[in-house]
Structures are given as structure tokens and as C-alpha cells.
């Protein structure tokens, strides 16, 4: 059993090293944002949930990225329940859907991803000591196929993928006021990237 456990541990370690190296190379100027989660405060009476929680590696992914890129941690409270448009607390619906009484229905994972991104930008502004941060966009050739706007696609990370990144940079600075104004500031399609908690997928969201 010990032999198989060590083999599994080494495979996980190798995968995380390749994943973090790939992310840091594909996005060399990026700031990676993670929720500041404490695994030990998340255990409950559900043994299956606790078993799956033990196998998650998000903290290890974040720590590995710290050696290769800039990593920030944000408050995880209500990231999946705060409306990305008006900021009010939303009601949970069945499955991966949340509802705002004012703004309508959203995908829960998209909402979480957007709010983590928003809090990360606000934190970066404080750390940089300015009223805004430079905005930079990236276009990736032949890395991901085009998907309809607003749709979610799960992609298994490939450690052998290489991509050219023609980056269009803007020196404009901005103040984050509300998500509607924020999205319109960008002169390129806003894409938010997040790593699944189990480290198995790279989630890509196209903000409409």
C-alpha cells in the first residue's frame, strides 16, 4: 500500500509542478488570485465530503505558483453568493444556479470566479498604493477553440502545450466602481481563468 500511495503522491506532485509551470509561462505578467481557504474549517459530518476534501490540492497549487509568479489571497466569504452586477446577496437555486432578485439568474461558478477576480484587483490596487492598475490583455493562438460567449468549457491542462502570446498592452488606469463599468473598460474580450479545486481542469469563462 505504501508503494502505491507514494506513486500516487509523486504523480500528483508532478502534475502540480507541470500545471503551475504552464500557467506561469502562458501568463508571465499575470497576478494569480486564490481564495484564502482553510481546509480544516471546512470539515463536516459528511464522510464522503471530508474524504474528497482531504484529496484537494488547491493550497499546494497556490504555494507552487508563489515561487514562479505573483499570488494574492482574497476573502472567500460569499464569493458565490454576491451578485456581480448589483452586489446584493443572491439566493441559491438547485444545482449550479444562483438568483438575484434584481438582475436575474447566474452560473454559480462564473459568479465565484468573477468575484474572486474583482477582489483580487481591489487588493492589488491597495498593495500597489495607487488608484488603479495597468490593464493588459492576451490573445492565445491555437491554445483553446472559440466557444460561444458566456459558456463554460473544461479543458485538461497539457504540460506540452506551447503558445505564442501576442500581448496588447494598455497604459490606461482605472478605478473599480461597479462590474458593468469595469467590463466596458477593457478593449479586449474579458476572460477570467480559474483552476478547479482538485487541480484537474482549467476553467475558462468568457464574460458577456
Curated annotation (Swiss-Prot):
Residues holding Zn(2+): 83, 86, 100, 103
GO molecular function: DNA binding; metal ion binding
Keywords: DNA recombination, DNA-binding, Metal-binding, Transposable element, Transposition, Zinc
InterPro entries, per the entry: Cas12f1-like_TNB
Highest rank taxon of the organism: Archaea
Membrane-spanning segments: none
Biological processes per GO annotation: DNA recombination; transposition
Protein family according to the UniProt entry: Belongs to the transposase 35 family.
Name recorded for this polypeptide: TnpB-like protein MJ0012
Organism name: Methanocaldococcus jannaschii (strain ATCC 43067 / DSM 2661 / JAL-1 / JCM 10045 / NBRC 100440) (Methanococcus jannaschii)
Lineage start: Archaea, Methanobacteriati, Methanobacteriota, Methanomada group, Methanococci
Amino acid at each position: 500500500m505504501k508503494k502505491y500511495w507514494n506513486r500516487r503522491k509523486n504523480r500528483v506532485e508532478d502534475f502540480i509542478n507541470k500545471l503551475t509551470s504552464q500557467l506561469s509561462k502562458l501568463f508571465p505578467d499575470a497576478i494569480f488570485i486564490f481564495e484564502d481557504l482553510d481546509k480544516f474549517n471546512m470539515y463536516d459530518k459528511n464522510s464522503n465530503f471530508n474524504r474528497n476534501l482531504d484529496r484537494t490540492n488547491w493550497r499546494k497549487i497556490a504555494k507552487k505558483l508563489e515561487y514562479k509568479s505573483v499570488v494574492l489571497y482574497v476573502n472567500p466569504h460569499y464569493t458565490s453568493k454576491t451578485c456581480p452586477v448589483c452586489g446584493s446577496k443572491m439566493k441559491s437555486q438547485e444545482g449550479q444556479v444562483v438568483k438575484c432578485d434584481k438582475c436575474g439568474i447566474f452560473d454559480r461558478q462564473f459568479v465565484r470566479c468573477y468575484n474572486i477576480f474583482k477582489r483580487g484587483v481591489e487588493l492589488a490596487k491597495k498593495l500597489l498604493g495607487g488608484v488603479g492598475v495597468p490593464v493588459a490583455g492576451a490573445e492565445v493562438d491555437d491554445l483553446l477553440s472559440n466557444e460561444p460567449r458566456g459558456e463554460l468549457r473544461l479543458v485538461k491542462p497539457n504540460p506540452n502545450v506551447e503558445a505564442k502570446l501576442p500581448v496588447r498592452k494598455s497604459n490606461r488606469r482605472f478605478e473599480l466602481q461597479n462590474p458593468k463599468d469595469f467590463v466596458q473598460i477593457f478593449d479586449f474580450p474579458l476572460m477570467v481563468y480559474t483552476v478547479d479545486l482538485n487541480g484537474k481542469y482549467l476553467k475558462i469563462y468568457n464574460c458577456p
